[in-house]
């Protein structure tokens, strides 16, 4: 089956109303763009096949500007709208990883509802991905490599060229007289993927002509086995993960280590996190899951933090220390730090009504300066019929996790705490 008819059949099965093509300007994505342009002309779609393209300008090469212009010229030729998005690459975890993260986050920003991202990964890419997973010591999920349709970074992705080799794409490009750019970094074997592509895999293909197809079969076996495990664990997983970013630990200790790690991996995958290594997962289980009950353990995983409180794991972002903030309320609206939103105040004849997120509290008017602070230690009287109690005990009774306690706006009249917005009022002086 040729490229055009195969992709045509794939698109007939797709439920998307539009397609966003990831266009680098290289051979693979240029072929993909050409195929979609042909399909749009060939198929009597009512409405017409909706196709857009996006080019990510990483700024890593001195040729990046000329690549962007090439992509624009290409899209003008095919009459396909193009988005050019410039990104900053965080090189903390390596250029490859940083560029990939920046690329997909930029694409996610532009992907529309009912639109699917289309990438030009082919059979040779699949082999490289499998070997890189093997190098990392990945399990079934990693060795499952890429699927023709999947979800990545929360985006639906279609890879219609996954069953074709690079040679087949080259033959098509030459037949259609297509022009494409070549990234000079492709020859740099310091990058693992380039080392495999340029040094290792050509020798394996020379020895075994159908090596890529064999790797694809193995990857598919791994994917199917992982799907089977997920199916078998689905009932248990539903019991432990009733809220997406939380994981209940009740009965968890009774499971085998294999079942524990499988369930945690499912939870991390549900939250679209990269899979931790086996060492990291073991550390998570030992240091967080099974930490002492009174402990407040946490585990950093890329840009997220896993915390435990009252027999439950929580997935949060890293939080800033807000305890030194003292914000004067001089207008009706105050912007709070660390993405906590706005706190606003309304006034009537006798009272001030403070609003924050879905919470509100009504306090008497005052001539004292009003400030918003975070974090407090000491005893307060939060109930008319109860004596003063340590604020830590109050938070515990309200089941507020330790890391959230210092993120709740505290209203002060002068130097006197009057309320933790949405949780309690203070009824006496201290």
UniProtKB/Swiss-Prot annotation:
What Pfam families does UniProt report for this protein, alphabetically?
Answer: ATP_bind_3, TilS, TilS_C
Q: Which SUPFAM superfamilies match?
A: Adenine nucleotide alpha hydrolases-like, MesJ substrate recognition domain-like, PheT/TilS domain
Name its cellular compartments.
Cytoplasm
Q: Which reaction does it catalyse?
A: cytidine(34) in tRNA(Ile2) + L-lysine + ATP = lysidine(34) in tRNA(Ile2) + AMP + diphosphate + H(+)
Please tell me where ATP binds in this chain.
24-29
Chief location of this protein? cytoplasm
One of this protein's GO BP terms? tRNA modification
InterPro entries, A to Z: Lysidine-tRNA-synth_C (IPR012796), Rossmann-like_a/b/a_fold (IPR014729), TilS/TtcA_N (IPR011063), tRNA_Ile_lys_synt (IPR012094), tRNA_Ile_lys_synt_N (IPR012795), tRNA_Ile_lys_synt_subst-bd (IPR015262)
Q: Name one GO cellular component term.
A: cytoplasm
Reading the lineage from the top rank, the first entry is Bacteria
Q: Known PANTHER family for this protein?
A: TRNA(ILE)-LYSIDINE SYNTHASE-RELATED
Q: What's this protein's family per the entry?
A: Belongs to the tRNA(Ile)-lysidine synthase family.
Q: What is recorded about the domains?
A: The N-terminal region contains the highly conserved SGGXDS motif, predicted to be a P-loop motif involved in ATP binding.
Q: What does this protein do?
A: Ligates lysine onto the cytidine present at position 34 of the AUA codon-specific tRNA(Ile) that contains the anticodon CAU, in an ATP-dependent manner. Cytidine is converted to lysidine, thus changing the amino acid specificity of the tRNA from methionine to isoleucine.
Write the protein's name.
tRNA(Ile)-lysidine synthase
**What taxonomic lineage is listed for the species of origin?**
Bacteria, Pseudomonadati, Pseudomonadota, Gammaproteobacteria, Pasteurellales
Q: Which gene encodes it?
A: tilS
């Amino acid at each position: 089956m040729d490229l055009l008819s195969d992709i045509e059949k794939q698109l007939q099965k797709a439920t998307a109303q539009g397609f966003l093509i990831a266009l680098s300007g290289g051979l693979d994505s240029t072929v993909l763009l050409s195929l979609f342009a042909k399909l749009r002309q060939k198929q009597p779609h009512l409405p017409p096949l909706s196709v857009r393209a996006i080019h990510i300008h990483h700024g890593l090469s001195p040729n990046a500007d000329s690549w962007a212009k090439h992509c624009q010229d290409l899209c003008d030729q095919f009459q396909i709208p193009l988005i050019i998005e410039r990104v900053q690459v965080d090189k903390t975890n390596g250029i490859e990883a940083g560029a990939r993260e920046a690329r997909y986050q930029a694409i996610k920003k532009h992907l529309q509802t009912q639109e699917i991202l289309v990438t030009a990964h082919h059979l040779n890419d699949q082999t490289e991905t499998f070997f890189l997973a093997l190098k990392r010591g990945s399990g079934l999920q990693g060795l499952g490599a890429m699927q023709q349709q999947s979800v990545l970074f929360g985006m639906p992705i279609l890879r219609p060229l996954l069953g074709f080799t690079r040679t087949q794409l080259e033959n098509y490009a030459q037949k259609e007289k297509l022009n494409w750019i070549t990234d000079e970094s492709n020859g740099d074997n310091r990058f693992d993927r380039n080392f495999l592509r340029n040094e290792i895999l050509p020798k394996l293909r020379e020895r075994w002509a159908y090596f890529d197809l064999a790797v694809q079969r193995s990857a598919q076996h791994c994917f199917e086995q992982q799907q089977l495990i997920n199916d078998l664990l689905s009932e248990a997983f539903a019991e432990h993960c009733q809220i997406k970013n939380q994981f209940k630990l009740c009965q968890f200790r009774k499971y085998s280590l294999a079942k524990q790690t499988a369930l945690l991996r499912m939870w991390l995958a549900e939250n679209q996190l990269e899979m931790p290594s086996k060492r990291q997962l073991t550390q998570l289980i030992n240091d967080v899951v099974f930490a002492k009950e009174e402990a407040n353990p946490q585990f950093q995983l890329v840009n997220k933090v896993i915390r435990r409180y009252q027999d439950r794991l929580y997935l949060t972002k890293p939080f800033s220390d807000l305890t030194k903030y003292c914000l004067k309320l001089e207008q009706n609206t105050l912007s709070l730090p660390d993405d906590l939103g706005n706190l606003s105040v309304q006034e009537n004849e006798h009272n001030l009504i403070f609003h924050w997120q879905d919470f509100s509290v009504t306090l008497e008017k005052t001539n004292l300066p009003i400030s918003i602070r975070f974090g407090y230690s000491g005893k307060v009287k939060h109930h008319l019929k109860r004596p003063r109690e340590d604020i830590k005990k109050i938070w515990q009774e309200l089941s507020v996790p330790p890391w959230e306690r210092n993120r709740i706006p505290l209203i002060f009249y002068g130097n006197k705490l009057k309320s933790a917005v949405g949780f309690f009022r203070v009824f006496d002086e201290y």
